[in-house]
C-alpha cells in the first residue's frame, strides 16, 4: 500500500545520499592525491 511505497522511496533516497557522500570522500582523496603527485613532480621530489 501507501506505506511500502513511502518506505521504498525513503530507502532509495538514503542510498543515493549515502553514495553521494562516499563519492565526495573518494573524490576528495583522488583530488588530494593528484595534487600531491603534481606538487612533487613540480618540485622534482617524486
UniProtKB/Swiss-Prot annotation:
Expressed by the skin glands. GO terms for biological process: defense response to Gram-negative bacterium; defense response to Gram-positive bacterium; hemolysis in another organism. One of its GO terms (cellular component) is extracellular region. The keyword Disulfide bond applies. Disulfide bonds join 40-46. It comes from the Eukaryota. It is found in: Secreted. InterPro entries: Antimicrobial_frog_2 (IPR012521). Its main location: secreted. It holds the Pfam family Antimicrobial_2. Keywords: Amphibian defense peptide, Antibiotic, Antimicrobial, Cytolysis, Disulfide bond, Hemolysis, Secreted. Belongs to the frog skin active peptide (FSAP) family. Brevinin subfamily. Shows antibacterial activity against representative Gram-negative and Gram-positive bacterial species, and hemolytic activity. This is Esculentin-1. It comes from Pelophylax lessonae (Pool frog).
Amino acid at each position: 500500500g501507501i506505506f511500502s511505497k513511502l518506505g521504498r522511496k525513503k530507502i532509495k533516497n538514503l542510498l543515493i545520499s549515502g553514495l553521494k557522500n562516499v563519492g565526495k570522500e573518494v573524490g576528495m582523496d583522488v583530488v588530494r592525491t593528484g595534487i600531491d603527485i603534481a606538487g612533487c613532480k613540480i618540485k622534482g621530489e617524486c
